[in-house]
């Protein structure tokens, strides 16, 4: 019998008490010879992306049992960023990532589980689970709940696709009729699943494919489609195979750190840049890499952003395409195949299927595959019926989107730009870098100069926008919203969406040491590092200061002399205990958030905790 981790609690006379407790959960003596596989679920009725996961843990557990393993399910917390948005609840979102990772470590190590299968979906849950996977480095597969279908409404007798961002945008527009706002509210999120655009949740689920830790189709196959059930069944069977191979044959090739290597992280970031994904993915990939002791930094991201083309625009960067359309065009595998054609990928990396990337693309690229089952899977589309139940429909597109000139995925020859949809800027405001989603910035705004209008909280900035105090040419500065200063690094979806509803999104810039929702577009620059609370120079900006932003040259610059900058630093330090703190902000910070703030590092380090011993 192989030496499973779980033998610590299942073998030997001295473990009679532990075995007695295991038996009380339904295990038998025969089960003690099998691998114990943790089914790490994240079901909650608070989140549409997780509302349908309750029974999916049971589905996977049954497959594990049939394949010769013992499944033991537990749950993590899951916060809905959309519901937590716009109030103090958003302070808790990013810190929950660390709690999720820690809770998984606690459960896995306390009970000596042999492997795990992670059922994730939304914003901080997938990153938290990935952090745990790299930290623990035991056999692991990711399977997500899948994206929801896009909403559809008719305006002027024409059907248009909508999503959550439309509900926020139209409700903030004083010119929108109440009936229209109500219609959009009722139609924006029609089914279970992660929101239908390429926001943080779907970006991260796509990246699990690129990292090699999930099955092809995981990031794009709709939650409502019957084909997604096949992914769950396949994942449940595969985790047992991988686990037994590791413990019986000492095959370490499919352990998380050997799959998600430095080369895999570079591939994942290249995918993210090519599809113009959420800027949050940068934050999370840095944190996940750190857990695996993988050398992956902002410098790598900066280098990739200058050579990886922008090949795909999905909502919120497009009003035409949503995740269902990305899937029809070949999804993650289709986009990776385009990057592979121009030699921008590391091909000799493995995935949970035990295949290298080149072989995987030969099988799953819709432009070249001969496999009818693969073609059929990528034809899986939306049915257009409201539901919170998964696997309820089997609609298929009449044909695939293979148009690489004007379709959802473009070839290099027809790229939106030769450098990608994300960029890292540096300058005296952000010595350690900051992030902008160029996919959401119009060409006219790639170079922008404006005067600062400074706020020390998101709430004050929102109030100023809604009261009409923001003018064309302003650079809105929202500081003390970083990991430490917030604390919790709030998302700035409401300020950016309100700017859009006021018609100012292409005439202003917004810079912050906070972060942005994956639904953000416009000239929105976040993750400024060091943050204000860590003595970053964003704390020194004054109203009316001139700020220069040059995305092609990767520069963000406060237009003052170096002598003036040094003087401002000196004056700030004279404030003693009040230096580098928000002076006028009133905000309750709970003990739990204070603990996170005490350990939190700036965004260029992934906003992870620096544990001091």
From Swiss-Prot:
GO cellular component, one term: cytosol
Known catalytic reactions: (2R)-2,3-dihydroxy-3-methylbutanoate = 3-methyl-2-oxobutanoate + H2O; (2R,3R)-2,3-dihydroxy-3-methylpentanoate = (S)-3-methyl-2-oxopentanoate + H2O
Residue numbers of N6-carboxylysine PTMs: 124
Natural source organism: Buchnera aphidicola subsp. Melaphis rhois
Residues involved in Mg(2+) binding: 81, 123-124, 491
Source taxon at top rank: Bacteria
Pathway: Amino-acid biosynthesis; L-isoleucine biosynthesis; L-isoleucine from 2-oxobutanoate: step 3/4; Amino-acid biosynthesis; L-valine biosynthesis; L-valine from pyruvate: step 3/4
Name of the featured protein: Dihydroxy-acid dehydratase
GO biological process, one term: isoleucine biosynthetic process
Record: active site: 517 (proton acceptor)
Gene designation: ilvD
Record-listed E.C. numbers: 4.2.1.9
Family matches, as SUPFAM superfamilies: IlvD/EDD N-terminal domain-like, LeuD/IlvD-like
Family: Belongs to the IlvD/Edd family.
